[in-house]
Structures are given as structure tokens and as C-alpha cells.
A protein has these predicted regions:
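Flexible "arm" and connector segments at domain edges
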Residues: 1-140
Length: 140
């Protein structure tokens, strides 16, 4: 996702807000769900840190601004309907305000889910090798 693509999302479906799922970039574990407006997404892309729109305070907030447990952005994409945002992030500490890695503490990950990131990484490397072999670090 780039800054130029922000306006192409389906902002009208959620009254200017879209759900933003934050997923651990390495393990694939879902860390939290927040909401973004266009300004929050713009700030997320520009700063490299996850920024949400607080529905209760009606303002932007950077995840980790009080705790120091920021979510560093690895990648941002959307679903097929452009009405949900997926943020792959590197958490700098617990994500949940209750001190747990994920806000979804009751979720039980299977061995397959824990290792799914390996298949994803393999696909990324394979794609990069075939896309630009002359400039690909992985193709050397």
C-alpha cells in the first residue's frame, strides 16, 4: 500500500473508518484489531508505526505512545473489497494493554498456524527471485 492508494479504499462503507487487523509479521499471529480513518492510514504509512483512530476519543493515537510498545510496520495491504486493512507489524513488546502478546489471548494456535509464516516467506522469496533476478539479493 502506498500513500497514493489511500483514496481508493472503500471509506464510505464504514462511515470513514475501516477495521485494521494487525498481524505479527513473523509468526502470523493476530495481535489486535483497531480502526483507521484516512489520516490514521496516511500517518501509519508515513511514520512506519501503526496509528489508529480512537472512536471513543475521536482522535488519532499511535499504538505504544504511552507504553513504548510500538508496532513497527512491515507491510500494509487490504482485502479484496478494499474495506479491511491488514497490517503486518513487528511488535516492540506486548501488544495488548493487559500486557499480553495479543489481544486475542484465548486463541489457540495449531502447529500448522505457528509454522505458516515459513510458507509465506518461501513464496515471497520465490516471487522475488523470478521477478527481478538481476537485482534480487535472494537470486544471487
Amino acid at each position: 500500500m502506498t500513500l497514493d492508494e489511500i483514496h481508493t479504499l472503500a471509506w464510505n462503507k464504514g462511515e470513514g473508518l475501516l477495521p485494521a487487523i494487525v498481524q505479527h509479521a513473523i509468526t502470523g499471529r493476530v495481535l489486535m484489531l483497531g480502526y483507521m480513518n484516512q489520516d490514521a492510514l496516511r500517518e501509519t504509512l508515513a511514520s512506519g508505526r501503526v496509528v489508529f483512530f480512537s472512536r471513543s476519543r475521536q482522535q488519532l493515537w499511535t499504538k505504544g505512545e504511552t507504553s513504548g510498545h510500538f508496532l513497527d510496520v512491515v507491510d500494509v495491504s487490504t482485502d479484496c473489497d478494499a474495506d479491511t486493512i491488514l497490517v503486518l507489524a513487528d511488535p516492540l513488546g506486548p501488544t495488548c494493554h493487559k500486557g499480553t502478546e495479543s489481544c486475542f489471548t484465548d486463541a489457540v494456535a495449531t502447529d500448522a498456524q505457528r509454522l505458516a509464516f515459513l510458507a509465506l516467506r518461501e513464496n515471497i522469496i520465490t516471487h522475488r527471485i523470478s521477478a527481478q533476478p538481476e537485482s534480487s539479493y535472494t537470486a544471487r
